[in-house]
Amino acid sequence: MINQAAIMAWKDNAPWVHAAMVEQDLIICKALVCIFGDEFLASQLAFRGGTALHKLYLTPQQRYSEDIDLVQIHPGPIKPILLRLGEVLSWLPDKVTKQKRYNNTMLFRMESEVPPVQPLRLKVEINCYEHFCVLGLQKVPFKVSNPWFDGECKITTYALDELVGTKLRALYQRKKGRDLFDLQVALQSGNLNVARVLECYQRYMEFVVDKVPTYKQYVQNMEEKMQDHEFLGDMDLLLREDAGRFYPTEAYKQVRAAFIEQLPGKRE
């Protein structure tokens, strides 16, 4: 789908370990321009998740990310959005749409162009139930300049503090070391308002659970993960080629001091 010269040219923007990852990164970037360059989709969808953090705020991108996470801004029928999304992404092959009550997913499958040939999969997932925003939606300029594709748009997304607040929720909810990495990088950017991050975390956590985890529950959750090999090794192949190692123990110390120690609950 993409000539090898264009993929290699993109490596300056996406210095990932494998050429297939560079190719996927370029595909993601074109897809973002196609989605948010469309007036209808830009008014209906907001970009969220790790890919949004690294593509829009934590630049240059510190880790590889393979999916596009979107949120339906307003409650309403999802079918018109899915139809238009399929149209603007019609250049991607083998589309499969999976619909559930709270999220809808489009999967595209292809093979990499640079040997050794590897299967590639792009997942575009739409959260269809969190129709709210704490700090207001943002419009962030985004540009792709490559021999294969050249384009730009303004991406509808959330404020940095809100994206990081949802990351703090994700760190508790799932077992992926990349969430810990993202929080550390966000802290090191020096651009965070920790009080606003915690406000957003509280709002998003309240939306999905009856009782927000206490300080003690969050610490226990993290201490279990810090003994889990899958969690600790999640970042092994996701770092830039020119990056140093990721040290989860040090990252946890920083994230705990900045965020977790501010959570309500007894200290024992």
Language model features with spans:
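Glycine-rich beta-strand-to-loop/alpha-helix junction loops that act as flexible
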Residues: 47-52
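Structured mid-to-C-terminal alpha-helical surface segments
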Residues: 1-45, 56-63, 68, 72-268
